[in-house]
């Protein structure tokens, strides 16, 4: 993955392609009970020290790392990641409220795909104990990733997230796999050689059981449509959740807003909120014509 990012950046036509800012790695230091569609055989413990090899191989390409903050030995990984400038996000976690509270005090700034693959309220001796989900909603300073593809979360939960986190505390993500934007069919989740076959109907990817989700097939413009049309979020707020908010979460000041001196990387949406043109550094590199898509 890291090599692919580097190759993409160094390609002869890289200046006309989407800008790759780095990689977001989910795992392998996650809770097996919250693995989602991930293959359990690849889950590791941070106690084995293998995270050092991952950081070395990343060579600066790793920007966000999703880990489960309750794991034994996670503190050493956290320290190593911070030293490399990697942002930590809590996810695929079966931890308690206190685990995310500790994580937030130790440099975590994000929570990965809110509601998906994370613990929630349990009963212990009759008492209710909040989990990672409740901590993510309550704790200030944690930006929440939200898969607003119209499938993972219903409009009611999208509205609840906006009400609790506020428009500035949300980053919309596709959580897409390689079937994104493609026709319905069978696609590989993970490695092309060793990955899992999953089934896309054009709206969502599912595991072979036909029930469990295996990632999204949405493109980012769908997120904006879902938030505005189904969740009732004002357009300017939905746009902010896919532009300025993620830029701020990554600590990037040169993108995410239209302002003199910033990079003129733009996506133009039509009245139907579908993409009709793409600009990079102020130059149009793609547009949708009446006869179909074309690069310029």
Protein language model features and the residues they cover:
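His/Asp/Glu-enriched, well-ordered alpha-helical/loop segment
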Residues: 128-146, 150, 162-174, 179-269
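Structured loop/turn residues at beta-strand edges in well-structured enzyme cores
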Residues: 18, 60, 106, 168, ...
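Active-site core of metal-dependent hydrolases
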Residues: 52, 56-184
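Conserved, mostly hydrophobic/aromatic
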Residues: 25, 81, 111, 227, ...
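Divalent-metal coordination cores built from histidine and acidic residues
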Residues: 1-61
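Short, electropositive alpha-helical surface patch
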Residues: 1-14, 78-87, 162-169, 234, ...
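C-terminal cap of metal-dependent C-N hydrolases
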Residues: 248, 257-295
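Conserved protein kinase catalytic core
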Residues: 30-33, 119, 181, 287
């Amino acid at each position: 993955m890291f090599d692919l990012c580097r190759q993409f950046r160094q390609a002869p036509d890289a200046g006309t392609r989407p800008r790759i800012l780095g990689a977001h790695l989910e795992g392998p230091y996650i809770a097996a009970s919250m693995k989602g569609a991930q293959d359990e055989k690849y889950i590791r413990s941070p106690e084995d020290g293998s995270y050092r090899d991952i950081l070395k191989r990343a060579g600066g390409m790793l920007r966000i790392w999703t880990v489960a903050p309750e794991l034994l030995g996670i503190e050493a990984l956290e320290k190593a990641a911070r030293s490399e400038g990697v942002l930590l996000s809590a996810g695929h976690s079966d931890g308690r409220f206190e685990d995310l509270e500790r994580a937030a005090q130790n440099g975590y700034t994000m929570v990965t795909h809110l509601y998906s693959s994370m613990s929630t309220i349990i009963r212990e001796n009759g008492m209710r104990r909040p989990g990672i989900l409740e901590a993510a909603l309550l704790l200030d300073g944690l930006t929440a990733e939200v898969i607003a593809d119209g499938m993972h979360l219903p409009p009611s939960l999208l509205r609840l997230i906006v009400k609790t986190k506020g428009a500035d505390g949300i980053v919309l993500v596709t959580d897409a796999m390689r079937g994104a934007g493609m026709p319905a069919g069978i696609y590989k989740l993970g490695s092309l050689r060793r990955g899992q076959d999953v089934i896309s109907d054009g709206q969502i990817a599912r595991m072979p059981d036909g029930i469990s989700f295996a990632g999204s097939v949405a493109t980012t413009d769908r997120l904006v449509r879902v938030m505005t049309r189904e969740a009732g979020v004002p357009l300017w707020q939905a746009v902010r959740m896919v532009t300025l908010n993620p830029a701020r979460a990554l600590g990037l000041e040169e993108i995410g807003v239209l302002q003199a001196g910033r990079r003129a990387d733009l996506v133009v949406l039509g009245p139907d909120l579908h993409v009709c043109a793409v600009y990079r550094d102020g130059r149009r590199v793609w547009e949708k014509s009446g006869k179909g898509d074309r690069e310029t």
